[in-house]
């Protein structure tokens, strides 16, 4: 049975494809989840993909990832990136390798988006690659944990 990673998406990411497409593109959350599932499988991993607009639910899933012995977490915390000490603490607490992802380049946007509480709890951060950032995050996570894409 393949090792599992969690791909967690935070608030408003359910609106991908329709919310500000000039910034976030036209890909939907279903497209993101399909890309993540396929990329994980190519690395011999299984992806559990979830989205919530609620901070506590995201924290519960981070804890569940530990309980289910997941080997990695990819997190797009959305707006919680800039405000949530609790998400930071959850990631630090579970001690699972994590990658922070953002569809847009947060550093080319409003100054309040330039700070991330998630970054210090993750071993890597990716932003500005569109949904391809998720693929890159999974490939980086696979390399970190010692699996790799199959040719």
UniProtKB/Swiss-Prot annotation:
Catalytic activity: 3-dehydroquinate = 3-dehydroshikimate + H2O
SUPFAM superfamilies reported for this sequence: Type II 3-dehydroquinate dehydratase
Disulfide bond annotation, renumbered to this chain: none
GO terms (BP aspect): amino acid biosynthetic process; aromatic amino acid family biosynthetic process; chorismate biosynthetic process; quinate catabolic process
NCBIfam families, alphabetized: aroQ, PRK05395.1-2, PRK05395.1-3, PRK05395.1-4
Family that this chain belongs to: Belongs to the type-II 3-dehydroquinase family.
HAMAP family in the record: AroQ
Quaternary state and interactors: Homododecamer.
Protein name, as recorded: 3-dehydroquinate dehydratase
